[in-house]
């Protein structure tokens, strides 16, 4: 492969990477903790919303609510990572990408 072909291939990969990054920013996943807490996050792991079931909001038991929120965030984060790995996987050639 000559240098010009390599450069063209690199530009093409960069363009595809940017397209996928934009797609991830516009794609959401949901993480849940039972039916009590739902966290919506985009493919970049940015939290977009948190929904709480009214019955889980108990001023006498804040710890349970905190645990449920942490669990829902962890679930959404795992799903966002899986989504990113799935979309970026072909470009990475099986390598683990930092931050994903």
UniProtKB/Swiss-Prot annotation:
GO terms for cellular component: bacterial nucleoid; cytosol. GO terms for molecular function: DNA binding. Coiled coil: none annotated. It comes from the Bacteria. Keywords: Cytoplasm, DNA-binding. PANTHER family: NUCLEOID-ASSOCIATED PROTEIN YBAB. This is Nucleoid-associated protein RoseRS_1534. It comes from Roseiflexus sp. (strain RS-1).
């Amino acid at each position: 492969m000559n240098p010009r072909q390599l450069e063209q291939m690199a530009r093409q990969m960069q363009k595809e990477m940017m397209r996928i990054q934009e797609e991830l920013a516009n794609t959401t996943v949901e993480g849940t903790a039972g039916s009590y807490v739902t966290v919506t996050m985009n493919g970049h792991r940015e939290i977009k919303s948190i929904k709480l079931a009214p019955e889980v909001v108990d001023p006498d038991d804040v710890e349970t609510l905190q645990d449920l929120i942490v669990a829902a965030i962890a679930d959404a984060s795992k799903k966002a990572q899986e989504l990113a790995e799935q979309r970026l996987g072909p470009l990475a050639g099986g390598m683990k990408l930092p931050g994903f």
